[in-house]
Each structure stands twice: as C-alpha cells, then as structure tokens.
C-alpha cells in the first residue's frame, strides 16, 4: 500500500480545491496516482452534489455578457451569500454566460452541466443554473445591462431600437437607456405594454374588483367605471411603458421615450426587457 504524505494531500487540494479528507481518501483509493485521484474526486463530488439538490438554494447572483451580436443574463443560485462571493463561483458564472452568449445558446451543453456539478462538489453547496436569457441583437438595436449591488442579486437587460443608429453615441440616449435599466430594477414591471397582458388575466382582475364592490350599493354603471379605473391603474403598475418614470413620475416611460426621441431627432423603441432576481 502506498504511503500518502501530507504534502501529497496539500498538492491535490491546491489543484482541485477539494477538502483535506476527500483528497486523502481519493489518493488512497487511487494508490497515490494524482490523475486517478482527480478523477475519483470528480466522481465523489458529483455523487455528493446530487445528494445536495434537495437543499434550499435561495442565494446566488446574476451574471451578464454582451458581444453586440447576442446579449444575455444568467441566474445561478447557491445556498449562502458567502458562496455567492466565492471566486470559483463568480468565475464559473462569468465564464458560463460568456460561452452561452457567444454560442447563442439558451441551454447548457453536457460539458457545462458537468462543470456545474464539479463546482457544486468543490464548494459543497447546492448550486443550480436557474434561468438563462439570451437575446439576439438586430440591426439598429443596442442593449443596456444593469447589475445591482456587490452581489448582483438583480440583473436587468433592456434592448432598444433606434431609427438612426448613429444616435446611439448620443450621451442623452445612453443615459436614458441606463435610467430605463435602473427603472426596471426598481419597479420590476412584468410586461412591456398593456397589449402583452393576457386577456384572461384582465378578465379575472375585473371580476375580483367587481366582487369587492358588490356590497357598495353603487349602480352597475358606476361600478363598471370604478372597475375600469382600477384595471387601468393595475396595468400601469405591471406594464413598463405605462409606469411613471422612476426619475420623473409625472411622465410615463412611454412619454419619456417620446421626449428623448424628439431631443435626439430619432425614434426610440423598447424592443424587450428582462428582469432577473435572486430569491
């Protein structure tokens, strides 16, 4: 039987980031063969990672990347905020979103799934890729991305279209695009415009509001008017274009788009947005 020295264990730990006990066990099973020990660690790690999948992973962070052809956001969860700051965790997320954006994929390849399992094995937490959002950037479009805070617990991507693409260099437009991303981070709209809201959802809300007014004693016509007003207010809360702009709530986002379009002499359109949040 080969003798496993503390120096051997230390070397394997430095190369794999695995725990002391796991490294010692892997070296023993591998008879001191470092490459075989690494393979054993991966096998052991994947097995233990599978066991951790039922543990809550309510922490994590959002990662982003853009290469002017595609852009994307990635939400990776973990169990503790300490791990969300771990350099291995952060490096994995940054590398993964870059690979996904550059390939235009919105799902993990087999090799990427294996990397995820190996990371979970090394860090010893339940780590999961929860959400992937990749969008293609068409001609006359550009994106603005905002990650909130040191731990990037909120990530926002806003894609805009400009009739005159040369205007994307305009500071007013760039500032407005960032303000839009900040707005989405702060108010978390669900839809871009009212027309995107499912008609069945609106009908359900109308029924709820009407039910609340059943005992009010008001006439049917007045109740209909009140319900219509409540629906309008509710849609303004969940539709980005109808929300009061975060930096000037006297104007809606739609009205701010028109103002900035006039100022730079080029029509601006919000094509889509994405909001991801940990927790």
From Swiss-Prot:
CDD domains: UBA_EF-Ts (cd14275). Gene3D superfamilies: 1.10.286.20, DNA helicase RuvA subunit, C-terminal domain, Elongation factor Ts, dimerisation domain. It is found in: Cytoplasm. One of its GO terms (cellular component) is cytoplasm. Keywords: Cytoplasm, Elongation factor, Protein biosynthesis. Residues 80-83 are annotated as: Involved in Mg(2+) ion dislocation from EF-Tu. The keyword Transmembrane helix does not apply. It holds the Pfam family EF_TS. GO terms for molecular function: translation elongation factor activity. Belongs to the EF-Ts family. Associates with the EF-Tu.GDP complex and induces the exchange of GDP to GTP. It remains bound to the aminoacyl-tRNA.EF-Tu.GTP complex up to the GTP hydrolysis stage on the ribosome. This is Elongation factor Ts. It comes from Borreliella burgdorferi (strain ZS7). The gene is tsf.
